[in-house]
Amino acid sequence: MSHPAFWEDLYQRGGDGWELGGPAPALVDFVETGPPPRGRVAVPGCGRGHDARYLARRGYGAVGFDFADDAVRAARALEAQDPTGASFERRDIFTLGGDYANAFDGVWEYTCFCAIDPARRAEYVRAIASILKPGGWLLACFYPIRRGGGGPPFPISRSEIRRHFAPRFRFERAFPPIRSVPRRSGQEWMVLTRKTY
């Protein structure tokens, strides 16, 4: 999971079961009903870029990052066919702080956190905090909310979410999403947080 080859293989074999074919319902509902402030937004683990492209259409300066070349190529191809202004880069999310320190007003997290090795979750939180401007927002839909089981996707609990993010982020809202992908219904948890420094 910590190597691009793992994800490339999944894309090449059609094992990308996380692919929705469009933006995440939880993101769409949140942006349509109470959008976070506009600005430059990072989308880590963007896959084929549907969420980043949706955010760009809604007036955000969206940049999608993914570990897998195939994902970035697919996202760029979709963007070329139907331009939204989103851009896509093949990057290791754990090293983004080197080039993007305090560069983003917001981050949208969905299915990236659950895909990484749980032993690297604290490192992920540090990486996300490093690319956000002081006071920047993190909107996340965490999945799967359950105990036990392997992955990816690796399970997480609401208490673990708070434990990992509270040292660097202030929680403003936490709630079940209005809509979920049917197979994920009851297993997702939305949070809106602010970087505390």
Region locations from a protein language model:
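Class I (Rossmann-like) S-adenosyl-L-methionine-dependent methyltransferase catalytic domain
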Residues: 1-43, 47-102, 116-197
